[in-house]
Amino acid sequence: MTTGSLLAYLESEGYDCYAASVGPISSAWDRACELYAQLTGTTVDYGAAHSAAHNHDRYGKTYAQPLFSGWGPEKRIHLFGHSFGGATVRLFTQIACEGIQEEIDASPTDVSPFFRGGMDSWIYSVTTLAAPHNGTTMDGAMREDDATGAIYLPLTTLAGAIGNLPVVNGMYDFQLSQFGLTTLPGSYAFNVARLSEMLNFTTSRDHAGYDLSLRGAYDLNCQIKAQPGIYYFSYAACATQADGKGNWVPISSMETIFKAPSFLIGRKAEPYTTSFGLEINAEWRQNDGLVNTI
C-alpha cells in the first residue's frame, strides 16, 4: 500500500501496461468474464449455464473499446494478479485456453468466444503476487461450515447494502449489476425486491467470500491446471514473525489496518484436516496481514 504503483513503475521502465477493473467482491468466474470483455471491447457474458446456476443476469457491462488493440498470437500478454487477482488470472487463463464445454452446450449458437477456448497462444505468462491460492484462514472475517462449504461473509452483506446508499454509490461501484445490486449514482433503491437480490448474492457461492475460503479455493484448484507453453510465477509475502509461543505476529511496519486479521491468521491453534483433505497446521500461521504465506 505504501510502496507505490507497480503499473506506474513498469511503465517508467518502458513496458506497455494496462489495468482492468473487475468486481471487487465478485467471484473469480465473474471477474474472469469481466476481464475478457475489457480485453476485447465487448459485452460481459457470464455464461448461460453459470448465470442460470447462480440466478443472475447473463450479460453485464458493455465496453466500447478494448484495453488495447491487437490482442492475439502476435501480441501475447503477461497477466499479473495481486491477492484475489491471482485466482482471477489463473481461472481466466484456464477458460481462455480450454474453454468451458458446459457453456458451449448451454448456448451453442451464441456462446462467447471466451468459453470456446483455444487462446493458449494469446497468453505468455501468469504472475501472482500474495495470492491466496489455497484460500485464507482469516476466521475472524469469514466462517466456514466445512461440511457444506457455506460461507457467511459479513463484508459481502455489508457491501450489498451500503452499495445502494447515495453517499456510497456516487463514489464507489461494487460492480454487481448482474445481481441487480447497482443503482444510478446518487440514487437510492431499497425494497423487498432489493433485499431479495442481496440475499441471493450473499447466500450464493458466486462471490469472493466463497472463493477465498478454504473450500472455495479448493473447488477453484480442481478446475484450474497449468497450461503448456505458458509461464507461471507466484510470489508470496510474509509480514509476521514468531513470538516464541507458537504464534506469528505482525512486524512493526505492517499497516495498522491489517494487524487484527494478521493476529487471527497467525494465532496458535490445533492442527486439523478439512473434510476435503486439506491439512491446516502451523505452516499456515505466517501471513502478510490478509493472506497466508504458504
Question: Can you say where each PLM-predicted feature lies in the sequence?
Answer:
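N-terminal non-catalytic accessory region
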Residues: 1-131, 135-150
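Helical cap/lid subdomain of alpha/beta-hydrolase-fold lipid enzymes
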Residues: 94, 100-294
